[in-house]
A protein has these predicted regions:
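Hydrophobic/proline-rich hinge and linker segments of small-molecule sensing/allosteric domains
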Residues: 108-132, 235-236
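Extracytoplasmic small-molecule ligand-binding "clamshell" domains
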Residues: 26-93
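Beta->alpha turn/N-cap motifs
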Residues: 39, 69-73, 83-102, 110, ...
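C-terminal motif of bacterial Sec signal peptides marking the signal peptidase cleavage site
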Residues: 15-19
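Pocket-lining segment of extracytoplasmic ligand-binding domains
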Residues: 128, 140-243
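An extracytoplasmic/periplasmic, membrane-proximal ligand-sensing/linker region
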Residues: 30-59, 240-301
């Protein structure tokens, strides 16, 4: 009897040891689905909206979620490559990098004001005397982030195509920051995303700081635009479970049609819906990069 008891104790101990440090099933409290957002807007707003979205996804799917907002677009891509992030809300070019480097899988394309695409814009102070793309020659430009499609890649490619050389440029850290760099006189030109006017209000990056700087629409104006770019994505890391992926996609599409969902998504990245996406939808961006002889690897920073 004593031998049986000792044997049982040993089995329990071995079982306990083998379970130490082992993660639970994905989507549980001990191993939540990790959803990362890029810092293209003010971090505090992204966190607030991201948490609201995660809370609703938990109700709709039964899975547990955890959000994070790293300090750069590239950090989100690398986290997905290392399986530290399961879902990334990735801008267009960042998605292409994630697909190229780590075979990430697109799930959804965002919709803004009924459109699945957007443009990059060049903005200047209204009284600067800069009226066209050619006038940017020799000026200082505030781009957003090295991996931002509308805030750097497309604008810099357009300048290169037209042989226009700025005196210098720097990365402001986000779309609102690039707008403020122009507004506050730290740059002659700022680059960011642009979407059409909706209900009489411009829907570009200036809107993100309109509450704090109510005269920015009059003081800062767009003078040129890039070609159209497919919208941002909701992307899943390689080998993310297919059923969970479909559950999250369906939940996000359902949530986007509710009043609470519309508010959170609008506050997050000015999103008002989603459409199912395929990797081929983004070939137009790859073709543009190829035509301009730009390597994706240049922008993984």
């Amino acid at each position: 009897m004593r031998k049986i008891m000792l044997f049982s104790v040993v089995i329990v101990i071995l079982f306990s040891i083998s379970g130490c440090g082992k993660k639970g099933e994905l989507g549980t409290e001990s191993n939540p689905i990790k959803m990362y957002f890029v810092p293209s807007m003010e971090a505090g707003k992204v966190v607030t909206s991201g948490e609201a979205i995660a809370n609703e996804l938990e109700k709709l799917t039964g899975y547990k979620f955890k959000i994070a907002v790293p300090t750069s677009y590239a950090a989100v891509i690398e986290a997905m490559g290392a399986s530290q992030a399961d879902i990334g809300w990735l801008p267009t070019f960042a998605y292409i990098l994630a697909k190229q480097k780590y075979n990430a899988e697109i799930g959804l394309t965002t919709v803004r004001y009924g459109l699945e695409s957007y443009r990059g814009q060049f903005v200047v102070k209204a009284d600067s005397g800069i009226e066209s793309l050619a006038d940017i020659e020799g000026k200082t430009i505030a781009f957003t982030d090295a991996s931002s499609t509308s805030g750097y890649i497309y604008p810099s490619a357009l300048l290169k195509k037209n042989g226009i050389e700025p005196a210098k440029y720097y990365f402001a850290g986000g779309h609102p920051q690039a707008m403020l760099a122009v507004y506050q006189g730290r740059a002659d030109v700022g680059c960011s995303y642009w979407s059409p006017v909706h209900d009489g209000v411009p829907q570009d990056a200036r809107k993100a700081v309109l509450e704090t700087y109510p005269d920015i629409m009059e003081k800062v104006k767009p003078i040129a635009f890039t070609d159209w770019i497919p919208n941002d994505t909701v992307t899943f890391r390689y080998e993310f479970p297919e059923k969970m992926k479909n559950d999250v996609i369906n939940a996000l599409m359902e949530y986007s049609q509710t009043p609470a969902g519309k508010q959170s998504l609008e506050e997050l990245y000015s999103v008002d819906g989603f459409v199912l996406a395929k990797d081929e939808d983004y070939d137009v961006v790859r073709e543009a990069l190829d035509a301009l002889d730009i390597s994706a690897e240049e922008f993984v920073k």
